[in-house]
């Protein structure tokens, strides 16, 4: 019988640390860039997480200068802590070109009080397709202005369902009465599936978010048992 090993974590968390929070937030770096939207699989309510095969990420924004800018993008694979994966070449995680691709879906505003230019990009596309799961940083820059960065988008790509680890999450109510109104306690169980895990503390990174917020995420709670 094949019994999946599991890792159980109790998280009394919930005045949480601010670890690597900036990297996971979408950032607008130019005051003329507005209305940045990042939508996974046509569902605006979801976090920006797509599947390795079949998922689609849509990124759009408006440029209030109403002037044509040759915007391009660069795709960077990142580690669990959102630092660039230095051990990987671009060809290891991207089919096509990870940088230098231009955003060609451009529309000028018509009959609006404020003039703007709308730019839209979808991933994967014919020039750039992710071929490895993990965290990704998408950087948009202006080729007409010395490659000046105007926005950064953080998103994640997951393995197909049959290759994923199993994760179960349960909110508990038996917290101490003195903190029950201010904190939450959750129990997380991670099934290794077909992966060989000999050192969970080093091989597995866990993150628990409250209302999809990275600024108060709980990282790497110590497991109660394995």
Label every model-predicted segment:
Residues 1-25:
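Bacterial Sec-dependent N-terminal signal peptides
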Residues 27-28, 157-183:
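Low-complexity, Pro/Ser/Thr- and charge-rich linker/hinge segments at domain boundaries
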Residues 34-79, 178-192:
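Contiguous beta-strand segments within globular domains
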Residues 64-69, 129-130, 194-202:
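A short beta-turn/strand-edge loop motif at beta-sheet boundaries
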Residues 95-116:
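Extended, solvent-exposed segments with strong compositional bias
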Residues 115-127, 133, 140:
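Ligand-binding face of N-terminal immunoglobulin V-set domains in extracellular IgSF glycoproteins
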Residues 132-144, 207-210:
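Internal, hydrophobic beta-strand segments that form the core of beta-sheet-rich folds
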Residues 205-226:
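Long, internal scaffold/assembly segments composed of regular secondary structure
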């Amino acid at each position: 019988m094949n019994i999946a090993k599991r890792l159980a974590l109790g998280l009394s968390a919930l005045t949480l640390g601010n670890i690597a929070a900036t990297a996971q937030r979408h950032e607008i770096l130019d005051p003329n860039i507005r209305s940045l939207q990042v939508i996974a699989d046509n569902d605006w309510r979801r976090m920006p997480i797509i599947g390795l095969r079949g998922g689609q990420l849509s990124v759009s924004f408006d440029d209030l200068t109403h002037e044509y800018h040759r915007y391009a993008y660069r795709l960077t694979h990142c580690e669990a802590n959102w630092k660039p994966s230095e051990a990987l070449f671009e060809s290891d995680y991207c089919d096509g070109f990870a940088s230098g691709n231009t955003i060609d879906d451009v529309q000028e505003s018509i009959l609006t009080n404020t003039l703007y230019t709308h730019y839209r990009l979808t991933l994967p596309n014919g020039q750039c397709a992710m071929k490895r799961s993990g965290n990704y940083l998408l950087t948009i820059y202006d080729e007409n202005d010395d490659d000046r960065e105007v926005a950064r988008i953080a998103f994640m790509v997951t393995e197909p369902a049959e290759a994923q680890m199993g994760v179960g999450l349960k909110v508990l109510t038996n917290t101490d009465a003195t903190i029950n109104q201010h904190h939450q306690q959750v129990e997380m169980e991670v099934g290794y599936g077909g992966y060989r895990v000999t050192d969970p503390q080093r091989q597995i990174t866990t993150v628990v978010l409250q209302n999809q917020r990275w600024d108060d995420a709980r990282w790497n709670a110590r497991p109660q048992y394995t």
